[in-house]
A protein has these predicted regions:
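Sequence-level detector for tyrosine residue identity
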Residues: 51-52, 113, 127, 200, ...
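Long, contiguous all-alpha helical interaction modules
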Residues: 275-277, 281, 285-396
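Generic signature of intrinsically disordered, low-complexity segments enriched in small/polar residues
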Residues: 54-55, 116, 120, 130, ...
Length: 396
């Protein structure tokens, strides 16, 4: 049959539409290639190379460009400009640290921008040094230092996300802190990881804590007193544990650890987890060394925040869900170990800050009636830690 004019027009339209789709796909592919050439790899959980778009953003090529290669050059420029100002007071363009930070805040939560920013500086050590330099060269201006800690903490949080391979940063930063084991690096890293409105990547936190638990807080080398060392904890675990309080998955992975559920539904931790708890329960928690006026979290407050986050996996809505049951068992174990430790003779009532009591109240409310893993069967021990508003404790 001869083709009609309408048919030809329809086919031409379909071909043009396919060509448009192919062009858009090609442009997206170029975005991925452009990111890779900048040292940034964006991948899905399955490992498929991709690009980044914030939640709720339309997947148009204009938005793809703006959120990916469009922010790389901006990050590179602003990182270098902030480095100049951190040492000289102003950048080559005459801008102050505060002015540059205001511009950086526009993109600070974009993982692409964040990864490019840290890469431009040269990685973990120069990143820690950047905040130290800002602090050291802005004596008497704590607001500038705190603003820098907030901005750089957000950038680290964005760069720590899995879609930009942020898990490796946990090892990178903890290795620098461990190798230097000086109070300045510890306090600066704690400042970066105790920003209350940042959720850091799960693997980033777990890998960092895994390394930092090996660092004895009693052997941290003293250093110069700057604002950050007077305000933030000198305990290497303080920051990452506090950050786990906002990331329950990281808290459970670290405190519940690896293991398996036995025939009774209880958690059987693996050897690494047993050794971790042995270290956590035998180390000192009084090496914060902060100024008495400081309101920044202590290491023990971070520890109890992580325990509270992990305990949120207790009592799942659907006990038949195997993953939920596994998480419940691990959370019960972690909660039991935590309550057992904080109700022991290692702690006196006067050592519990208001924050610690609040965190432990959450743990107790979730789990004080089912702490078989820690052999706790009395509400006396529950109430020794913090007031429990859950009347289930009366039946412990």
């Amino acid at each position: 049959n001869a083709m009609t004019a309408a048919g030809i027009t329809s086919m031409r339209g379909a071909a043009e539409a396919l060509q448009d789709v192919a062009e858009e796909l090609s442009q997206r592919r170029q975005e991925v290639i452009g990111l890779n050439s900048s040292g940034i790899t964006v991948a899905s959980p399955a490992g498929v190379m991709s690009y980044y778009l914030p939640e709720g953003t339309d997947d148009t090529i204009e938005n793809v460009r703006a959120c990916n290669t469009g922010v790389v050059s901006t990050a590179q420029h602003e990182a270098e400009e902030l480095r100049q100002a951190s040492i000289q007071g102003t950048s080559a363009n005459g801008r102050t640290v505060d002015q540059i930070l205001t511009d950086i805040d526009v993109h600070r939560d974009n993982p692409i921008y964040a990864a490019a920013f840290i890469n431009t500086l040269g990685g973990a050590q120069p990143y820690l040094a950047l905040l130290s330099d800002i602090d050291r060269n802005n004596t008497g201006r704590p607001a500038t230092t705190e603003s820098a800690a907030s901005t750089l903490g957000h950038i680290l949080g964005a760069a720590s996300q899995p879609e930009v391979n942020g898990s490796r940063l946990g090892a990178d930063f903890s290795n620098i802190v461990t190798d230097m084991h000086s109070v300045e690096e510890v306090a600066v890293f704690n400042a970066l990881t105790t920003q209350p409105d940042v959720v850091y990547g799960t693997d980033f936190l777990v890998s960092a804590a895994d390394a930092l638990e090996e660092l004895d807080p009693a052997k941290i080398i003293p250093g110069d007193t700057i604002y950050l060392t007077s305000q933030y904890s000198h305990d290497p675990l303080a920051g990452v544990l506090y950050a786990m309080g906002s990331n329950p998955a990281a808290a459970l992975a670290y405190l519940g650890g690896g293991g398996q559920v036995d025939a009774h539904g209880d958690w059987e931790p693996d050897e690494k987890t047993l050794q971790r708890w042995k270290r956590l329960k035998s180390r000192g928690w009084n090496y914060d060394e902060q100024d008495p006026t400081s309101k920044k979290p202590t290491a023990a407050e971070g520890f109890t925040a992580a325990l509270a986050a992990a305990s949120s996996y207790r009592n799942p809505n659907d006990p038949s869900d195997k993953n939920a049951a596994r998480a419940d068992a691990a959370a019960t174990y972690a909660s039991g170990m935590g309550v057992d430790y904080f109700s022991s003779n290692s702690w006196s009532r006067r050592q519990f800050t208001e924050t610690m009591q609040k965190n432990l109240s959450v743990v107790i409310d979730d789990a004080c009636c089912d702490l078989r893993s820690a052999d706790i069967h009395s509400d006396t021990q529950c109430h020794a830690l913090a007031p429990c508003e859950n009347d289930r404790c009366l039946r412990c």
